[in-house]
Amino acid sequence: IANICQAIPDTNIDDIAATIGLDPRIGNLFLNAGPGYGGSCLPKDMNAIINLSSKIGVKPTLLNAVKKTNRLQISNIMTLIKHNIGKIQGKKITILGVAFKPNTDDVRDSMGIELVRKLVKLGANVTIHDPKALDNTRKIFHGNAKYTTTISSALKNCQCAIIMTQWKEYEKINNKTIKYMNKKFIIDSRRILSNKNLNAKYYAIGLGQKI
């Protein structure tokens, strides 16, 4: 539904989710569109149920579709990047947040890590910022990426910035923060900055472009 909203001008997935969540049988606790789910539990549990279903002769059609759709979110972000900055090789791209959720250093099955992996493979010069997860990220990418502890240094001279984790720190990003970006192009997978009038080309998952 978020991807549908993204294709329709002036449409916001958060409005749709809030309406759906009014139904007490559903609630709104987990209706948070983003770059895909990750972490140490949900992906593992999903795979376990799929494997069990296959072993006992039950075709897990819906579960396979959920897993495939989850992985497609990163592909959609990659498409946005390529469409706006062209060839990825040699471009400086900043990833803001690699922990699978805020307030943790856990990067297991993180969509941010998956995105970095794809960008590094294509030859991007990736700079990573995360308030807590940099040490665990270094163990994965070593010298294949750069790491920084400040948002301003992460954004300096970059041609694209992607917010992947909903850290409170990123809510403070403003026109002063992005002043020294080489190309002011931002992908906000969490819609953290959707209410700010940034002097930048801005895309957010689940948010249709303004007319």
Q: What are the functions of these language-model segments?
A:
Residues 2-211:
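Structural/interface elements that position substrates and couple domains in central-metabolism enzymes
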